[in-house]
């Protein structure tokens, strides 16, 4: 027994020495080999935001930073404008998304305001002298200028001053959300405090009807706003092209087309006939 133990000890020592010299790995025991074949359940990968959203010409690169967290995000960014790695600090992606919302709101107001005088004039609800196409209201002086209470240069300076002040306040709120509620402003500062999100300030001035009281409805309204804002920006572009090509307003264009679709359409207006 003693000799057997001595031989076993000697063999074990020799094997350990050989492993140290040649760097071989320890031989796994039978129980270890058996446990290595145990199949473990793979961890479920986290589901990204907007994983089930429709995609518009999205690329693997655009999907790396457009994760669906923004309203109306369908991965469409062929120029890579929202790519945080390719901007070089020139374009802030969050500011770009914010700018789309603000420009969409202005476009919705502009699209309605540009066509409203024509519609109201045709309906006889306003005097004919004020029922002008949008480009004859003084926006483009060579196309005609309406006579207001002041000359165009005075109105332009006044408009720039008022809009400049409003835009400056908006920029301040962007850099310091909620700061407008801390500065005295004719006793209105409480209503200008905002929600902490500059794009959706809320409050009595910016959400007087209290839309979006819960997270689900607010998300739906944000999506609808972005979609309508994008359509309005395209509509404004269409107004410019229509006015340049046809010389009449968009509502008159519509009436002419409905009266004679064959001779009043895009092709005939562009002289493709």
UniProtKB/Swiss-Prot annotation:
Changing residue 230 to L: Impaired complex formation with chlorophyll. Chlorophyll a 1 binds at residues 76, 82, 100, 230. GO terms for cellular component: chloroplast; chloroplast thylakoid; chloroplast thylakoid membrane; nucleus; photosystem I; plastoglobule; thylakoid. InterPro entries: Chloro_AB-bd_pln, Chloroa_b-bind. Chlorophyll a 6 binds at residue 257. Keywords: Chlorophyll, Chloroplast, Chromophore, Magnesium, Membrane, Metal-binding, Phosphoprotein, Photosynthesis, Photosystem I, Plastid, Thylakoid, Transit peptide, Transmembrane, Transmembrane helix. Binds at least 14 chlorophylls (8 Chl-a and 6 Chl-b) and carotenoids such as lutein and neoxanthin. Chlorophyll b 4 binds at residue 170. Chlorophyll a 5 binds at residues 224, 242. Chlorophyll b 3 binds at residue 167. It holds the Pfam family Chloroa_b-bind. Changing residue 242 to L: Impaired complex formation with chlorophyll. The N-terminus of the protein extends into the stroma where it is involved with adhesion of granal membranes and post-translational modifications; both are believed to mediate the distribution of excitation energy between photosystems I and II. Belongs to the light-harvesting chlorophyll a/b-binding (LHC) protein family. This is Photosystem I chlorophyll a/b-binding protein 3-1, chloroplastic. It comes from Arabidopsis thaliana (Mouse-ear cress). The gene is LHCA3.
């Amino acid at each position: 027994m003693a000799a057997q133990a001595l031989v076993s000890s000697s063999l074990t020592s020799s094997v350990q020495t050989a492993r140290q010299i040649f760097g071989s790995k320890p031989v796994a025991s039978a129980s270890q080999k058996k446990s290595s074949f145990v199949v473990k359940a793979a961890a479920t990968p986290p589901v990204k935001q907007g994983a089930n959203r429709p995609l518009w010409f999205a690329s693997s690169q655009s999907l790396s930073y457009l994760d669906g967290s923004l309203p109306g995000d369908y991965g469409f960014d062929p120029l890579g404008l929202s790519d945080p790695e390719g901007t070089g600090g020139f374009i802030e992606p969050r500011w770009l998304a914010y700018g789309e919302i603000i420009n969409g709101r202005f476009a919705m107001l502009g699209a309605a305001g540009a066509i409203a005088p024509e519609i109201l004039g045709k309906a006889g609800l306003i005097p004919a002298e004020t029922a002008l196409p949008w480009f004859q209201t003084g926006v483009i002086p060579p196309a005609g200028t309406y006579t207001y209470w002041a000359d165009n240069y005075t109105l332009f300076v006044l408009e720039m001053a008022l809009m400049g002040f409003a835009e400056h306040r908006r920029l301040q709120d962007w850099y310091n959300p909620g700061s407008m509620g801390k500065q005295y402003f004719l006793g209105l500062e409480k209503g200008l405090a905002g929600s902490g999100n500059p794009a959706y300030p809320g409050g009595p001035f910016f959400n007087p009807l209290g839309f979006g009281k819960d997270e689900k409805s607010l998300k739906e309204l944000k999506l609808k706003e972005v979609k309508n804002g994008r359509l309005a920006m395209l509509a404004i572009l269409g107004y410019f092209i229509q006015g340049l090509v046809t010389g009449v307003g968009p509502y008159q264009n519509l009436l002419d087309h409905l009266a004679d679709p064959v001779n009043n359409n895009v092709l005939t207006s562009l002289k493709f006939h």
